[in-house]
Amino acid sequence: MLLQAAVQNRNVPLASSASYSRLLRCRSPVVSVAALSKKTAAIVCSISQVYGYGTVDYERRPIVQWNAIYKKISLMEKPELGAASVLNQWEKAGRKLTKWELCRVVKELRKYKRANQALEVYDWMNNRGERFRLSASDAAIQLDLIGKVRGIPDAEEFFLQLPENFKDRRVYGSLLNAYVRAKSREKAEALLNTMRDKGYALHPLPFNVMMTLYMNLREYDKVDAMVFEMKQKDIRLDIYSYNIWLSSCGSLGSVEKMELVYQQMKSDVSIYPNWTTFSTMATMYIKMGETEKAEDALRKVEARITGRNRIPYHYLLSLYGSLGNKKELYRVWHVYKSVVPSIPNLGYHALVSSLVRMGDIEGAEKVYEEWLPVKSSYDPRIPNLLMNAYVKNDQLETAEGLFDHMVEMGGKPSSSTWEILAVGHTRKRCISEALTCLRNAFSAEGSSNWRPKVLMLSGFFKLCEEESDVTSKEAVLELLRQSGDLEDKSYLALIDVDENRTVNNSEIDAHETDALLTQLQDDL
């Protein structure tokens, strides 16, 4: 098979440039470890979409299909050129873009988590204010995107510069969502009070957003308090309110309370439980070991799928993987392929992830090879799953071979890719090679949204101490300083590193590195 050939011929450079395997060679003895097979169920929390596409435009619906523009932007070979390059090229070809088209493109980009490109489209429109009249709804969407891409300070500055007549409940809700995403509790609670005073907290959205914050902070009693306030003020719970409430009850480990909420949901004539309702319940049942109830909930998920909606299938694939039910996993996969014309990278990712978690590496490799000729783009998250499994099984050379294959195929290694390899070299006690991988992780595209796992750093520092390698330890500390990670005191405390401390540990704890790889697998 293609993957096997790539791994078996690692001495032959697969990429036009020097292959990774020739740059990093470690011949130290492998730390003997029994790989852990612990399976963990990913917690799924239904979070309301803060804003849908609601821009009202005076323009007539254009004949030109917006999805042609979307595809050009989303499949750019050089995304660093920005969405503006695509839009300028489109207009130079004599095709005038309309606001309706551009807002529809933004909607699709947001749907697939391409916030940076969506914001670039809005920036392009803002630079042509004489052509594109933007509304308060547009401002709310832009604020949400700015918060995701540029951070809270820029989002606050954008909010302050808006005309007062633009600062409606949608814009306030967008800023609230930005605070919640950043887990900025004090600012979120203060803004909610302002929204209460202005009469902007008379609908479910701000309460749903705050419930999400308290869920993320594991303050489940606060979720109940939000529900109580809504009922006190006769604010009807919507489907998102119920789904978050269900997730909160499940996170407390209470089957009875979760099922009681579901009964309330069923008795609410304005609510029809959707597939998210049952995927949330299935997730919680899996977490609590209620296999039969989980499988019943998953059947209800499947029954609620309408049209060619792909997302529910991704949840089904992931959750059947958490159950370890390979038969149902493949059945859903074949159904999925029969109802949609093409499966996106996320679909293949869900299947590969489940197979890896079930220990079926050979099956995961087959799916990887099936994905290669049909992929929309080379997504490093998919091979990362396999590389992580190889490293966990002490097959670093196999992981390096897949890395070389990724580069040959035009894939761009992510920070997580390099982190996985760094773990592999740490397990083999190769400090120099692990340090090289960490340097590459900090310089990889998108590294500003990444920081190394606590267990990764603890293991590396422990190895440095055992080998009396102060220089390598200091090199990683400098990388952390430059990235700003050392400014986070809670993160620093978890790493438990004192630059002047020397610890005499007998050996690297193999179980710790296995736990790290399990954590990496869940994040991938």
From Swiss-Prot:
PROSITE patterns: PPR. One of its GO terms (cellular component) is chloroplast. NCBIfam families: PPR. Keywords: Repeat. This is Pentatricopeptide repeat-containing protein At1g02150. Belongs to the PPR family. P subfamily. PANTHER family: OS04G0544400 PROTEIN, OS12G0527900 PROTEIN. InterPro entries: Pentatricopeptide_rpt (IPR002885), TPR-like_helical_dom_sf (IPR011990). It comes from Arabidopsis thaliana. SUPFAM superfamilies: TPR-like. One of its GO terms (molecular function) is mRNA binding. PPR repeats lie at residues 168-202, 203-237, 238-268, 274-304, 309-339, 344-378, 379-413.
